[in-house]
């Protein structure tokens, strides 16, 4: 899964990143359906003078989509997803590796 992230107005990047490191990422990595979580700051566009359309990109290695659905329904994850919604707008893309 690829997640595209933009912070909401007024959210400081340091606050968001600290919340990710302290609360969100450890919980996601505890999920049976997730093997890996990697977050990236987007700094610029290659060969373009414009601003990047997203501030962060996250890759999540999921081993079982059905299990992910069950994992996300847990009380802990619902609470954390609510917190995430206060920090950022996210677009989640379910992807399949082909190369």
Which ranges hold each PLM region?
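Macromolecular interaction modules
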Residues: 1-99
